[in-house]
Amino acid sequence: MILYHGSTMEVSQPRILKSEIGRDFGFAFYTTDIQAQAERWARRRAMIESRRTKTEIQAIVSVYEWDDSAAKHLQFLQFDGVSMEWLELVVTCRSRTDYSHGYDIVEGKIANDNVGETVSYVMQGIMRKEDAIERLRFEKINNQIAFCTETALRTLYFQNSYICGSVNP
């Protein structure tokens, strides 16, 4: 299976960054099987970095081959859609930096800006989880695959990278 990672640099050797707090499935290396989504991620990161550094920044997508058959030998959690279990994991991972779910790989929907707003309402106690699930059923939500352990990263093979855009300050 081909996977993509959007960034501002080529990522030939993926790593799990412990500095990225508040991610949907906790500390992990995040990919997607949707090329256009990875390109949006890359352009968004380039825009943020360009504003911060006041320099031109390239948006780069790294491409990987994933040996998904190896997932059979790993702790693999897959969500087919929005569910109570998915929401509870996202809320827990976003609100508790010390939380470790124990999975090598987690695949599921990504909490984009609209979804993130709903998740934050749940985290703040403004919205019940049941109401959030109902609201999220109508959202078009993209996919993400999070590689949460070094063992999981060894099933990911870098193929190439390409520039999908450039952002000026």
Segments (PLM) and residue ranges:
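Alpha-helical interaction segments
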Residues: 15, 19, 31, 54-55, ...
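Conserved NAD+-utilizing ADP-ribose enzyme module
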Residues: 23-24, 40, 44-169
